[in-house]
Regions:
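P-loop NTPase motor core of the ASCE superfamily
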Residues: 93-96, 101-105, 121, 152-155, ...
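Walker A (P-loop) phosphate-binding loop of P-loop NTPases
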Residues: 430
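Post-Walker A helix-loop "phosphate-sensing" segment adjacent to the P-loop in P-loop NTPases
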Residues: 442-452, 471-474
Length: 818
């Protein structure tokens, strides 16, 4: 390294001692274990396109470091921020239980880097070293060329869903420093600041180094490096996937050198001519040579007629250990993994220094032991494999089926390429949708997240009712919404985005959509423009009159204003229309059949930590659509309030297909999914009726597109085709979904496909015994047993309230099960 110029936040540029320039791109891996043959072929083609588009050499680096599982899971406790004792206790219990059941000791953390190089004209003369000087103009000219190469590489990586990001100067210095100081960097991973008068190399390379024939000793670590001496006889997409199975830490470096294409053509033609002579002009023709000559002719013709290029590939992999004996074991494991794929790794005897330097992130192939391949084949060297799924931090949620690694889930994590916090959950009856979401709610509540949930249960033992009873009336509310419940949610309530006494344009638009449901004639989904114009004016009058008394209007107020307008109207057509509106509204006032739901001021606490609205008693189809619509609008207001207070907010709509059955509901759900990012909220849409959900296909597609996370549980076979097309699932993923076991163990170990952005993976949802007894809604055995346990606890502790009984019951049932 000659220098790393610029400020820390600038794009990282490394100038090497020979005058060459380097820039760096970091990217994410892809869990390709569920990809089918077509997907893998496409990935190989994209990687070949990346190699073809590069006009200079590139180095691809994979750094795999093993994070102790306890340290990995500590990310959950670091996010907990609640002053509620029971939630703190539950988070601690979950954390300890999840640690106890781990069957892995570490979680591999894989980082992927691409080093793009450029050799300027003033350093191509190998007969004399670079002077170390060039004019500012020349330097900027060369950097512009390098930037163009980086942009080309960047776009190719982005097209492959690898989420590339150009590293800053500080990130580049830290990357190099960590490799040169393996022990020091564990104490502080940040490189020392550049010191005036001291070379960059001296600043970064501060550790002692000792070179032996078969290993290096660097900063207290024994390091061994091996190189690829013979690739497999035939490579295929995925032959490098076994790197995921390595239990050792390693740095894997691949160089792709662009060959001189003219020289390659001449060499191929010479080999062909030589083969023709040796195979045909001998006394006894060599049939094997004739056949190989024909194959060579085919390769030459294909190469000459296509845009394919020839590349020199070299591969190196280094690992470290605390002792020489342990290092030998690590190197043996690496060789064994490559041997299983038909490749040979050489120990690098007497070549350890050059081999190790070829793994450093400076884009220099010191050893240069290369293997020539054509561009279709270079695509099979795709190295960006990962077995991870979930999010970088969050709540413990399950285990990856492929790697057994713990899976964390944080809907609110911030990452590149993340559009929204929304989640889409789909599964057939009994697949465990409500169970999974109940468990997620239980683990997100200690993180300070507030929840509103809409559900329509079959009986009084709803999937979420017990969860509210467990947390208690001080924290939760379970609202049985219905015409006869006595509980009212006023649709005219204003939110923080509305001025006092004056509805915003969005509020008026939402009310007009509500009146589409209430007043639209049979056969029509909505009112016409003229009818909406009349109602718009009446709504403003109702708000103005109520505002004089420092109140918001209720449905009776609007009905009265409408009746008064009809009485004073002189135009017969308008009078008839207003009278028709007034009669229609009267059905939804206290004098009408449905007024008990919407006519009056909101009469329950809307500021609980967790609120569940159960619409089981809303049976009329039109009233049901109204109720779900009003509740969804209530969610929008709560999201705006939480944003104003800086609180996390999540809304769950269980069976979101209810909203998709009518246009106004579909538009509202679509609008809410789009605005969720603005509010910083999480919207969870749950459905089992996929065909109903797609009744309004445009809005349904938009809702799913705005869902960064998706949980796909066991499916009805008839829905798999729609699901595959909608979510663009591979054949392998569909096969995995078909193989998800039925709920014979009552969701104690259910399986699902988890999609977080571009990362797909199958996971096992493994609740703790206490989670199970909180979240279960199994009516034949579980609920009666839980109820009986509560009675026993009450008989022994008469002073316990209902919340205490719930908490003790699940605790003892969990202990018994465990």
């Amino acid at each position: 390294v000659h220098s790393i110029p610029g400020e820390d936040n600038d794009e990282g540029l490394v100038v090497l001692a020979d005058g060459c320039l380097r820039k760096y791109i970091a990217c994410k891996g892809i869990n390709a274990l569920l990809f089918d043959e077509l997907d893998r072929e496409q990935m190989a083609n994209q990687f070949a396109a990346l190699a073809n588009s590069c006009e200079s050499d590139i180095q691809i680096i994979i750094k795999s470091r093993n994070l102790p599982v306890d340290e990995y899971l500590s990310k959950y406790q670091s996010l907990v921020k609640t002053d509620i004792d029971y939630l703190n206790w539950y988070a601690d219990h979950t954390d300890k239980w999840f640690r106890d059941i781990q069957d892995v000791h570490f979680v591999p953390q894989r980082e992927f880097y691409i080093v793009v190089g450029y050799q300027p004209d003033d350093c191509k003369d190998f007969s004399k070293p670079w002077s170390g000087r060039r004019s500012v103009q020349k330097h900027e000219e060369y950097v512009d060329i390098l930037n163009r190469l980086v942009r080309t590489c960047f776009e190719q990586l982005r097209a492959s869903n690898l989420r590339p990001q150009v590293l800053s100067r500080k990130e580049v210095r830290d990357l190099i420093y960590i490799e040169l100081n393996p022990s020091l960097s564990q104490l502080d991973p940040h490189a020392p600041t550049t010191i005036a008068g001291t070379s960059e190399a001296s600043t970064l390379a501060v550790s002692a180094l000792k070179v032996t024939d078969d290993h290096l000793w660097l900063d207290g670590k024994f390091i061994g490096t091996q190189y690829l001496s013979a690739p497999p006889h035939e490579t295929w997409m995925g032959w490098l996937v076994d790197l995921l199975t390595l239990s050792v830490e390693y740095t894997f470096s691949t160089f792709i050198h662009v060959c001189d294409q003219d020289k390659v053509r001449k060499r191929l033609q010479f080999n062909y001519r030589t083969g023709v002579v040796t195979s045909t002009q001998l006394a006894t023709p060599d049939l094997d040579s004739i056949e190989s000559t024909r194959s060579a002719a085919t390769v030459i013709q294909e190469f000459l007629r296509s845009s394919n290029k020839a590349f020199d590939i070299s591969m190196y992999i280094s690992t470290n250990a605390e002792s020489k004996e342990k290092l030998i074991q690590h190197m043996d494991e690496i060789r064994r993994v490559f041997k299983n794929r038909g490749a040979t790794m050489d120990r690098g005897q007497m070549l350890q220094l050059d081999a190790w330097q070829s793994t450093l992130p400076v884009g220099v192939d010191k050893l240069a032991i290369v293997h020539q391949v054509m561009s279709p084949v270079v695509g099979t060297f795709w190295p960006f494999f990962t077995a991870g799924c979930g999010t970088p931090d969050g709540v413990p949620f399950g285990f990856a089926i492929a790697s057994r690694e713990p899976v964390l889930l944080n809907p609110f994590f911030r990452g590149a390429g993340k559009d929204a916090n929304n989640m889409f959950v789909v599964g057939t009856t009994g697949a465990g949708k409500s169970f999974a979401i109940s468990m997620l709610i239980l683990r997100l509540l200690p993180l300070g997240t507030r929840f509103v949930l809409i559900d329509k249960t079959v009986d009084k033992f709803g999937a979420y009712r017990f969860l509210t009873e467990l947390l208690g009336p001080d924290l939760c509310a379970y609202i049985d919404l219905g015409p006869g419940s006595g509980l009212i949610l006023n649709p005219f309530d204003l939110g923080p985005e509305d001025q006092a006494g004056t509805p915003s344009a969005d509020k008026v638009s939402t009310l007009l959509s509500l009146f589409d449901i209430m007043l639209a004639p049979e056969g029509r989904d909505e009112l016409n423009v003229e009818e909406k114009s009349l109602l718009d004016g009446l709504i403003h009058v109702a708000y103005m009159e109520a505002g004089l008394q420092n109140k918001v209007p209720i449905m009776s107020d609007l009905a009265r204003v409408t009746a008064q307008a009809a009485a004073s109207e002189t135009d017969p057509t308008q009078r008839d229309r207003l009278s028709q509106f007034a009669r229609g509204m009267s059905l939804f006032t206290k004098q009408g059949a449905f007024g008990g739901l919407v006519d009056g001021y909101t009469n329950f606490d809307t500021d609980k930590l967790f609120t569940v609205f159960d619409t089981r008693d809303v049976n009329d189809p039109r009233l049901e659509r109204m109720a779900v619509f009003i509740l969804t609008e209530f969610i929008r207001r709560k999201a705006a309030e939480c944003k104003l207070r800086g609180a996390r907010f999540a809304a769950v709509i269980d069976e979101a297909a209810m909203l998709m059955r009518f246009k106004a509901g579909a538009r509202l759900l679509d609008d809410l999914s789009r605005r969720a990012r603005h509010y910083g909220m999480m919207l969870v849409c749950i459905t089992q009726q996929l065909k109903d959900f797609f009744r309004q296909s445009e809005q349904a597609d938009s809702v799913i597109k705005n869902s960064h996370m998706k949980l796909i549980l066991r499916q009805d076979p008839s829905d798999l085709k729609v699901l595959k097309e909608t979510l663009r699932l591979s054949d392998a993923e569909v096969t995995a979904i078909e193989g998800f076991s039925r709920d014979e163990e009552k969701r104690k170990d259910s399986q699902m496909l988890l999609i977080v952005g571009a990362v797909h993976g199958t996971i096992r949802l493994v609740p703790s015994p206490m989670d199970y007894w909180v979240c279960t809604s199994e009516p034949i055995h579980d609920i009666p047993r839980r109820t009986e346990m509560m009675k026993q606890i009450k008989s022994k502790n008469p002073s316990f309230n209902h919340t205490d009984m719930c908490r003790q019951a699940v605790f003892f049932l969990g202990m018994h099960q465990e």
